[in-house]
């Protein structure tokens, strides 16, 4: 599992950015387009049972990008993330969501509830890699609205060491790539900053901007000694 050295000081339960989700209509086409335009090579992920979605993983070391597509419209419509992916595709948004990683989701949940946050139940998930390895996790949604949100969800991985998606072997055009910043837009930027302060503390890994709609606006990566922006 990637370390938590990027976690802000003072957070009782460390959290860091884990991954960013990019909605695509077709996984193969989306992966080819990402590689052609940005030089980032994706690897097969797997289907999310009961969620109606499947993914391709773009490893970034401590983090990763997740190309996510709807493979069963009925199942996807029953899940909050599936609905957001469908909405993002309809609106032609390049980014749909982002996630934070923690080692103790129950502690994070208790801290947020103690601050008065009304949270839905924790959800367990899994997928099977092409090699048969099963990856399991638990997630905590924060924003329960149906549309893409600027607020990330939180994930706790329940996997053996070395199996985090970001740690997979990558063959990007310019060598290893790393996520440097997630830029989100919010109609109520002050409220969004306050929430992210509770979730992530003071961190250079995110930036909040005033916007007409809520959501992830762009991400900044570094590869081959150069900055790479996806927006």
Model-derived segments and their meaning:
Residues 98, 155, 196:
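A residue-level signal for conserved active-site and pocket-lining positions in enzyme catalytic cores
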Residues 172, 181-211:
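Aromatic-anchored, glycine/proline-accented short structural segments
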Residues 27-41, 108-115, 188-200:
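Amphipathic alpha-helical segments
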Residues 2-4, 9-29, 36-40:
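Hydrophobic, proline/glycine-rich low-complexity stretches
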Residues 4, 9, 16-26, 54-57, 61, 66, 80-177, ...:
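Vicinal oxygen chelate
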Residues 61, 70, 101, 155-158:
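Structured loops at beta-to-helix junctions and adjacent beta-edge loops in soluble globular domains
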Residues 29-85:
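Glycine/small-residue-rich interface belts in oligomeric ring/scaffold proteins
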């Amino acid at each position: 599992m990637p370390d938590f050295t990027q976690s802000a000081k003072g957070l009782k339960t460390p959290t860091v950015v884990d991954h960013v989700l990019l909605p695509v209509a077709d996984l193969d086409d989306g992966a080819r387009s990402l590689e052609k335009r940005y030089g980032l090579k994706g690897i097969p992920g797997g289907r999310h049972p009961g969620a109606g979605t499947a993914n391709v993983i773009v490893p970034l070391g401590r983090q990763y990008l997740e190309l996510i597509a709807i493979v069963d419209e009925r199942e996807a419509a029953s899940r909050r993330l599936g609905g957001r992916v469908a909405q993002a595709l309809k609106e032609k948004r390049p980014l749909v969501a982002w996630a934070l990683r923690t080692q103790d989701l129950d502690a994070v949940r208790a801290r947020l509830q103690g601050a008065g946050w009304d949270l839905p139940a924790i959800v367990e998930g899994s997928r099977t890699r092409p090699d048969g390895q099963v990856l399991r996790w638990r997630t905590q949604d924060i924003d329960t609205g149906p549309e893409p949100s600027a607020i990330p969800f939180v994930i706790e991985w329940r996997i053996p060491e070395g199996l985090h998606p970001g740690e997979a072997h990558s063959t990007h055009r310019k060598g290893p790539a790393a996520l440097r910043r997630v830029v989100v837009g919010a109609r109520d930027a002050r409220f969004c900053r306050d929430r992210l302060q509770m979730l992530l503390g003071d961190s250079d890994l995110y930036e909040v901007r005033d916007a007409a709609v809520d959501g992830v606006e762009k991400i900044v990566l570094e590869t081959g000694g150069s900055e790479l922006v996806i927006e």
